[in-house]
Amino acid sequence: MEAEAVRQPVAVSVAATSSTAPARISRRGLTRPTVMVLRAVSLLLFFVLWWGVSLLNAHVFKVFNPILLPAPDEVLRTGMKMAASGELLRHITASLSRVLWGFGIAAALGIVVGTALGRSRLLEHLVEPMLEMLRPIPPLAFLPMMVLWFGIGEASKVAFITYAAFFPIFTTTIEGIKYVDPVLIRAAASLGATERQIFWHVVLPAATPNIITGLRLAFGLSFFVIVAAEFIAADSGLGFLINDARTFFLVSNMLVGAAVIGVIGVLANVLLRKLEGRLLRWRSQARGQA
């Protein structure tokens, strides 16, 4: 009962502070169907422009070799052939397994460490300087060392992704934990909530949007670095597919690999947004009660 008493009033307060986004959307007059149509038109224009430039280069201006800029329909046919042969699925599975392992480890470490440092000033002063020293170093700078330390197998790729994905999650988590509205914490404390109840029912829910943002950034970065890792030491994966196609000037194959990475990134972003909506469903419920 105490937890419920803490959760509902505080949820109403948080909901009130986040109620401006729908208003912004209504002022712009952009409903969900309108947004979907605009996005579809944008994609259509992109493919039409791509097709037009490819066609003009191949048959009119001939600025460079037409093989270097295949038309969208040619890339689509190549992708369908690769999918039918099972080659594309093999590369997708290899990259996804590496990304999910590295991203999962990074998410666990980033959320736990970020939460611990956000809740403890002592730990923050002890640990954060070391992490801040490592954070500006580009992940690619550590790739050769990862290969030397862990070999050319899966361990080096997973460790590389873990390192790259850790910092976005850690940074957004610690910021979300540290900068929770103190009014919410005082409101929960005035209702008799314990420190544990305040953390689970106030601090963590309030920090969840930051954490989800970090997860989205980290997942995109995970695919960025796995492609680089698969350029160097791999016999499968989307990075290997792109690099192997580059060697033989198979531009359509390269674009298929790049397109698949883009599609996976979009799907992951949608799933993480759905997860955020489920985790924060209490906000909309509280807004309705308010």
Language-model segments: residues:
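Transmembrane alpha-helical segments of polytopic membrane transport and secretion proteins
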Residues: M1-L44, V270-A290
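Periplasmic/extracellular loop-to-transmembrane helix junction in inner-membrane transport proteins
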Residues: A23-G29, L56-G104
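N-terminal signal-anchor transmembrane alpha helix
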Residues: T34-V60
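Transmembrane-helix boundary motif in ABC transporter permease subunits
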Residues: W101-L131
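Short cytoplasmic-facing helical segments at TM-TM junctions of multi-pass membrane proteins
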Residues: P129, T172-G214, L238, I242
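Generic hydrophobic transmembrane alpha-helix motif, especially the helices
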Residues: E132-P168, E175-G176
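Transmembrane alpha-helices
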Residues: A159, Y163, E195-A228, S252, ...
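Hydrophobic alpha-helical transmembrane segments of polytopic membrane proteins
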Residues: L238-K274
